[in-house]
Regions:
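Conserved donor nucleotide-binding strand/loop of the catalytic core
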Residues: 1-12
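Short acidic donor-binding/metal-coordinating loop in glycosyltransferase active sites
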Residues: 4-5, 35-37
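Conserved core of the sugar-phosphate nucleotidyltransferase
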Residues: 10-20, 38-127
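Short, well-ordered alpha-helices that flank and scaffold nucleotide-derived cofactor binding pockets
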Residues: 23, 50, 145-149
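Short aromatic/hydrophobic "clamp" motif used to bind/position activated sugar donors
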Residues: 30-31
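Hydrophobic helical membrane-anchoring modules
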Residues: 124-125, 130-151
């Protein structure tokens, strides 16, 4: 289905394109996989569908667990930790990084929230290697190296 020109710019939001799609296609569950995330697997997709189909979640998206590392702003200020009380890594709960590569949602949730996720949200945890999102030349080189190593 062609998108209207206003949804085809460098600044168009994916959520707006998904809402446009939902107005023209009948579906219960939408799977949105970004082309820039080539390592998302059918297992990840199926897990997300099952999470939403079971009605335990209204939507779900792919994440990777990341252990705590000290983060700094460009102004050289610690982000979310106290420089005078640096925690030990093993004492800090891990965080989950949104992959940007896979989203599963119901039509109702999408149309109500106007967002790809909302309501009761679930995480589809994927290994770091499948969480690569190609947004730079370095990301592309990394993806090519991974493909070369498994070919």
């Amino acid at each position: 289905m062609p998108r209207p020109s206003e949804l085809c710019t460098d600044h168009s939001k994916s959520d707006d394109a998904l809402i446009h799609f939902s107005k023209h296609v009948d579906f219960d569950i939408l799977v949105f996989q970004q082309a820039t995330s080539p390592f998302i697997s059918p297992l990840d997709i199926n897990k997300g569908i099952k999470m939403v189909e079971s009605e335990c979640f209204d939507s779900a998206f792919a994440v990777t667990k990341e252990d705590w590392l000290p983060r700094w702003s460009m102004a050289v200020n610690p982000i979310n930790w106290d420089i005078n009380n640096r925690p030990m890594r093993q004492d800090v709960d891990p965080v989950f990084i949104e992959s940007g590569g896979l989203y599963v949602t119901t039509k109702t949730q999408l149309e109500n929230s106007k967002l790809r996720y909302g309501g009761k949200i679930g995480f589809i945890e994927v290994p770091t290697i499948r969480n690569i999102d190609i947004n730079s030349f370095e990301d592309l080189e990394l993806a090519e190296a991974i493909i070369s190593s498994i070919s």
